[in-house]
């Protein structure tokens, strides 16, 4: 997998991700200005609730569907797509039932009253839409329709924003829940239309029950993985609400959203193009080479953005939320380092999902989710809100070490020395840039290290492309 292809995919998915994230931050900005940090905390909790149910009822279809379709022979691909569609409808119905059954007890368990029960019920209606979207996205992704997927994401984000903003302004907290529903239902409908247009010939294909059973078996493991992650997020937010209040949850949500947003297009590109490619790799050596190239490209793409998080964090909080969100800055700084670690570990995580044994996937993800939930819950009661961000970085590092060990054993090889040197050098540069920016009085001074890192990464990318072209010429 060439650097050029990775960067083209990143440009497509990155452009879409920028629009999606801009829409999300505009919505968060409106909530912060109208309802304050408590409103931001509420939208974070509502999203965690609907995401937790979606992860459980979705049964890992968004990932298992890609793996099954991408790895199938061309003659069998239509049958696999038909199976993903059929299972997607069934799981969407299951998700709707689960959301409607659970929103009331979860409301009481969290808020000790039914004050936000209506809002939670509306947020539950987003669950089947999210599950359906995962099925249609899997079809487009595995079929290589990256540009179609990007266009759909842009249209869905803009439409959901235009419909959701008036609801927030008019109905307050109920409008927040409605905006979550609109942000889910619009993309689901558009993705459904795009999937039908991209693969019209599967409409009359008979669904094989063996394919359904395999998707259920594989998806069961992936569901456990996704659900553990969502449950971990929900438990952490619940602990923050209990011990630090809704305002504390709002600061955590602001830092979490910003830290995951700027490098988000790198992760989106990994899921859109890298995952189906590593799933279809002919052997472990080929998969290892694809993974190493992805990590190198991810570091070059993501390093300037992590530098922006570290050097321009305060400015980001003021622009995207409000000047009253300065309490989120220490959390953002810690989370930025967790994101840097994930630039290297996420490709390994995708490799594990694509090629790892089911039991290994469940074991490693369970360990990661357990640490990600228990560590912040324990630390918050002793060291306050910032410990939740510290725990985020620690859990990212622990998970990375664990999956790296599995990768080394299963692939019977390791990455080249160049990758290790590049990673440590980038970490040192980022730390120096953060230290320099912290000593400046002007909020915009952080643009200097960001620009320098961006220039260095651009030069490194051009060097990698020239070296790849030279190797091809020699062959």
Which residue stretches match the model-derived regions?
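N-terminal membrane topogenesis motif
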Residues: 1-24, 78-82, 115-117, 206-225, ...
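Interhelical loop/hinge segments that connect adjacent transmembrane helices in multipass membrane
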Residues: 1-6, 180, 191-233, 273-289, ...
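Membrane-water interface segments that mark the loop-to-transmembrane alpha-helix transition
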Residues: 8-20, 24, 46, 55-107, ...
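Transmembrane alpha-helical segments of multi-pass transport proteins
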Residues: 22, 121, 368, 417-470, ...
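Alpha-helical transmembrane segments of polytopic membrane transporters and translocases
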Residues: 29-30, 41-58, 221, 236-239, ...
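Helix-loop junctions and terminal segments of transmembrane helices
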Residues: 58-74, 142, 255, 259-299, ...
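Interfacial segments at transmembrane-helix termini and the short loops linking adjacent helices
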Residues: 106-123, 292, 309-343, 347, ...
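Hydrophobic alpha-helical transmembrane segments
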Residues: 117-124, 150-199, 256, 366-374, ...
